[in-house]
Every structure is written in C-alpha cells, then in structure tokens.
C-alpha cells in the first residue's frame, strides 16, 4: 500500500505510514519518534563536525505534510525529539514559531527520551510515558511490556529489490509491540538483526520498510 500498512495491536487498528509515522485513525493519534531536532548543532558544538544546516527544516517539512494530510487530534513525540537539551534551545525563532503552528489546535505530548530526558521549553505535555486505551507509548521498549508503542532504536532492514540490496528505515511489529523508525534527518539506524532487537521482538515479527511506499517482510533476524 502506498500510504501505509495496516495492522492490529491489542484491538487498535494502526497504520505504519510510508513516511515513518504511526497513525491510529480511530483516536486520531499521530505518533512520531526520534526527530532529533538540532542534531547538526550538537555535532558542531561537541565535536566540531559541520553538517548541512537544513536538518530541522527538512524534518519539520515532512512532519507538517503528515499533519496537514491527516489532521490529528493528538500528536505524540516518542522521545529524542531534540538531540539534547541544549539543541532544544538552539532552534531559531522561525523554527520555534513553526513548531508552535504545528501544535496549534491539538493535544501535543512530548515523551522523554534518553537524549532529552527532561522538560523542554515548548508547549505541550511532558511525560515519561502515555497511555490511551489499550496502548502505552514510551521511548524505550520494555521486554516484559505488551500493547507497547516505542522508538529509540532507529530500526532499519534490508530487502532484495530487482537484484540489488536496499536498506530502509522500518517499523518492527509483532503481537505485543511496535517499534517506530527514526523520523529525523541524519538519524542513522540499527539493523533489525542486531542482538538487542532480536531479543525484544518475537520470531514471528514483521518489518515495514518505509520510503515512497511501504514494503512488508518478515523481520530479518540474521
């Protein structure tokens, strides 16, 4: 499916969008993980590495397009929304006002991540985790949890397409949880066959590769 792959998690019908966002149509909840806004600023500040300065603009443009298309009542940012707390303060006035426009008229929830482990100076609720209906939303998956939506690992998977190998950010899901891909620009990724992901996910898990269209495969585990 071009726009997304629909699956069920504890009775909630969810759509893994080709963009990398998760959409719960029944509750009009849009969920995004690992924006890492201000990553270029952090890299320059900590290591002197200069990255192209457009990462915030690119990330917000793609997020805005999804919000305009779906009209969510609730947006949940699953942690690591900013690359660190200093990066949250590095956004210029245009970028700050852009975020405020995206937040306007809807509930906005910032889940704390390991890169931004405390409240940031933006409107919205700042929570360690959030529950709605059967689902719990948090940054890092807990192996014993069920009905869980999380991020953190930036999963990616590889598939053979027309005799060549293609690697894409991906959702990972089984009958207990879904892990979202990173949405931010310059975020990199962890292969789905990494030991930590194989330990969290069940053997019958699936990967939903993102990009121009979704491509669903059994989660690569070797």
Q: Whereabouts are the PLM-identified features?
A:
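Extended recognition/assembly regions associated with phosphoester-bond processing machinery
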Residues: 1-222
């Amino acid at each position: 499916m071009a726009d997304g792959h629909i699956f069920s998690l504890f009775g909630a019908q969810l759509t893994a969008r080709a963009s990398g966002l998760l959409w719960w149509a029944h509750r009009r909840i849009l969920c995004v993980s690992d924006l890492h806004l201000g990553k270029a600023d952090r890299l320059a500040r900590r290591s002197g590495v200069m990255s192209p300065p457009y990462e915030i603009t690119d990330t917000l443009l793609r997020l805005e397009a999804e919000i305009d298309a779906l009209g969510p009542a609730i947006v949940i940012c699953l942690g690591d929304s900013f690359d660190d707390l200093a990066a949250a303060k590095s956004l210029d006035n245009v970028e700050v006002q852009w975020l405020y426009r995206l937040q306007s008229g809807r509930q906005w929830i910032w889940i704390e991540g390991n890169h931004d482990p405390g409240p940031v100076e933006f409107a919205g609720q700042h929570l360690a985790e959030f529950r709605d209906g059967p689902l719990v939303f948090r940054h890092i998956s807990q192996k014993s949890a069920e009905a869980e939506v999380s991020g953190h690992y930036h999963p990616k998977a590889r598939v053979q397409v027309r005799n060549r190998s293609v690697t894409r950010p991906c959702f990972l899901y089984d009958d207990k949880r879904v892990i979202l891909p990173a949405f931010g620009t310059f975020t990199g990724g962890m292969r789905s066959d990494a030991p930590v992901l194989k330990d969290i996910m069940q053997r019958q898990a699936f990967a939903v590769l993102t990009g121009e269209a979704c491509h669903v495969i059994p989660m690569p585990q070797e």
